[in-house]
């Protein structure tokens, strides 16, 4: 059993002086901004001390322990409002920042890092705050001020943040962190260093990292995950061993693409109608905004592909799949009407999936995608009209996608509102076309199965032929029989004019 670390981000709704949340602190935003500024000033002072210390000759330096103690006491002296453990976190974080950047600073490759006065986070050790649930209110009890300061202010050392916990997943995490003495130790979560931080819109958040036990998933090579690059959905996946599925909507991609296209047209029109002052600086300067836009689009695509690849591999690990089957991308844009596939760097996505899967010991197999969207994953019947629309699949032979089926036991019946087998609720089956394709792709050796079926029925199929022994196979760069690499690649099928 291992451990993993994640974090939850909770918006602060209000701050109170008591755990019952009856005495409201009206100036809490101003108080947090002041504390954030104190943390930034103390952190910058520590960084300057570290720079001065390591700039001195070694024989003139005090011990590093004495240096860190001096930094701590200077922080407390500069801002007595800060609790000792908060001051300690400031010193430790400054040390980490210095260690990461010291070499680059002395080489004059970067300037001295600084904490921003307006957005520096307030860091608190995990033993000076706790989570409280009072009826339906979620509260974080924080020791925000030192004892010396609280005596002068008369408001106490602790503040109570009322936070927004809106979804069931976050509520479950909050409850598990709060109940440290969980009955099942395998489900207990341990809180980490709390950060209180303001975003660029001026809203305050509590970021709570937590550690939780993870069980090592045993990957089974016979469990296969099929990944379909679809039209209705950008990416859809299914498994050969279960009915579970997942998908990624390509809406954000289309939105970004339209925004970039509109911006590019706008810039081109500006260049076209610009005055002589701009044109006189040469072509390179005139086209610089378009180049910047192209770089932005490239970075967005790279980020999205990383995110998609991570989600796909994580889904495979969660289901214990030792194999991921994806479509062989050669010629795929010529055989589909998907704008996503034609305009997106899907080869880069495939490469990222392969690399991330390799890190976890998962094998990635590229299969020939022919007829995977037209084949019924239940009975194997291949027919173009099976896909009644871009998003709906209905098999013309077995009725998959148009049957009446029980939700509980999946019994198929002709009519009725109640299952004849278990008495459960029945409803008409709706099958997503991309899910059916992903289910086909998750079948081991699916391209070979489809090729043999096509040859049997006389359906045209783009197969690969070995020049040495004449063996015909669905995909691959080497012959499955003789191992020769001298194979005849099929020509791309193009739509008739």
Curated annotation (Swiss-Prot):
Note in the entry: Belongs to a group of putative class 2 CRISPR-Cas systems, type V-U3, which lack the proteins involved in adaptation.
Family, similarity comment: Belongs to the CRISPR-associated endonuclease Cas12f family.
Active site: 228, 327, 434
Residue ranges, annotated region (Target nucleic acid-binding (TNB)): 375-432
A Pfam short name: Cas12f1-like_TNB
Region (RuvC-I): 224-374
Keywords: DNA-binding, Endonuclease, Hydrolase, Metal-binding, Nuclease, RNA-binding, Zinc
Sequence segments annotated as region (Wedge domain (WED)): 123-214
EC number(s) per entry: 3.1.-.-
Region (Recognition domain (REC)): 29-122
Function as written in the Swiss-Prot or TrEMBL entry: CRISPR (clustered regularly interspaced short palindromic repeat), is an adaptive immune system that provides protection against mobile genetic elements (viruses, transposable elements and conjugative plasmids). CRISPR clusters contain sequences complementary to antecedent mobile elements and target invading nucleic acids. CRISPR clusters are transcribed and processed into CRISPR RNA (crRNA), which requires a trans-encoded small RNA (tracrRNA), but not this protein.
The protein, known as: CRISPR-associated endodeoxyribonuclease Cas12f1
Uses, biotech or industry: The small size of this enzyme and its ability to function in E.coli suggests it may be useful for genome editing.
Linker, as annotated region: 215-223
UniProt subunit comment: An asymmetric homodimer. Guide RNA is probably required for dimerization.
Organism of this sequence: Syntrophomonas palmitatica (strain DSM 18709 / JCM 14374 / NBRC 102128 / MPA)
Cofactor: Mg(2+); Zn(2+)
Alphabetized InterPro entries for the sequence: Cas12f1-like_TNB
UniProt GO MF annotations: DNA binding; endonuclease activity; metal ion binding; RNA binding
């Amino acid at each position: 059993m291992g451990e993993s670390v994640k974090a939850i981000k909770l918006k602060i709704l209000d701050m109170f002086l008591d755990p019952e949340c009856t005495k409201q602190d009206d100036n809490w935003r101003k108080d947090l901004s002041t504390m954030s500024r104190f943390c930034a000033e103390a952190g910058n002072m520590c960084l300057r001390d570290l720079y001065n210390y390591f700039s001195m000759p070694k024989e003139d330096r005090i011990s590093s322990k004495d240096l860190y103690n001096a930094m701590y006491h200077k922080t407390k002296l500069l801002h007595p409002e800060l609790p000792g453990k908060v001051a300690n976190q400031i010193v430790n974080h400054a040390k980490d920042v210095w260690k990461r950047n010291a070499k680059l600073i002395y080489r004059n490759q970067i300037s001295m890092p600084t904490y921003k006065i307006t957005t520096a986070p307030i860091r608190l050790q995990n033993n000076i705050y706790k989570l409280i649930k009072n009826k339906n209110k979620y509260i974080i009890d924080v020791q925000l001020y030192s004892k010396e300061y609280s005596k002068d202010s008369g408001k106490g050392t602790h503040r109570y943040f009322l936070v927004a916990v809106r979804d069931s997943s976050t509520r479950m995490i909050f409850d598990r962190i709060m109940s440290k003495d969980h009955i099942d130790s395998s489900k207990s979560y341990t809180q980490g260093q709390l950060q209180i931080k303001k975003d660029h819109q001026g809203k305050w958040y509590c970021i709570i990292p937590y550690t939780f036990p993870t069980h090592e998933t045993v990957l089974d090579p016979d469990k296969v995950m099929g990944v379909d690059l679809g039209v209705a959905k950008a990416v859809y996946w299914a498994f050969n061993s279960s009915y579970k599925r997942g998908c990624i909507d390509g809406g954000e991609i289309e939105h970004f693409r339209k925004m970039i296209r509109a911006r590019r047209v706008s810039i081109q029109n500006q260049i076209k109608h610009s005055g002589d002052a701009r044109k006189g600086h040469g072509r390179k300067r005139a086209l610089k905004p378009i180049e910047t836009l192209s770089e932005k689009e490239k970075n967005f695509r790279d980020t999205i592909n990383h995110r998609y690849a991570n989600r796909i591999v994580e889904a495979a690990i969660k289901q214990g799949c030792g194999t991921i089957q994806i479509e062989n991308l050669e010629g795929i844009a010529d055989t589909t009407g998907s704008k996503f596939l034609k305009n997106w760097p899907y080869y880069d996505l495939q490469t990222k999936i392969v690399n991330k899967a390799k890190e976890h010991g998962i094998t990635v197999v590229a299969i020939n995608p022919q007829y995977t969207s037209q084949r019924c994953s239940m009975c194997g019947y291949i027919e173009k009209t099976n896909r009644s629309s871009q998003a709906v699949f209905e098999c013309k032979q077995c009725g998959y996608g148009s049957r009446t089926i029980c939700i509980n036991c999946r019994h198929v019946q002709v009519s009725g509102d109640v299952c004849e087998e278990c008495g459960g609720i029945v409803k008409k089956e709706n099958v997503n076309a991309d899910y059916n394709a992903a289910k086909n792709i998750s079948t081991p050796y699916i391209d070979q199965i489809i090729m043999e079926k096509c040859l049997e029925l006389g359906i045209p199929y783009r197969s690969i032929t070995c020049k040495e022994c004449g063996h015909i196979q669905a995909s691959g760069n080497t012959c499955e029989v003789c191992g020769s690499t001298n194979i005849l690649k099929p020509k791309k099928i193009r739509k008739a004019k």
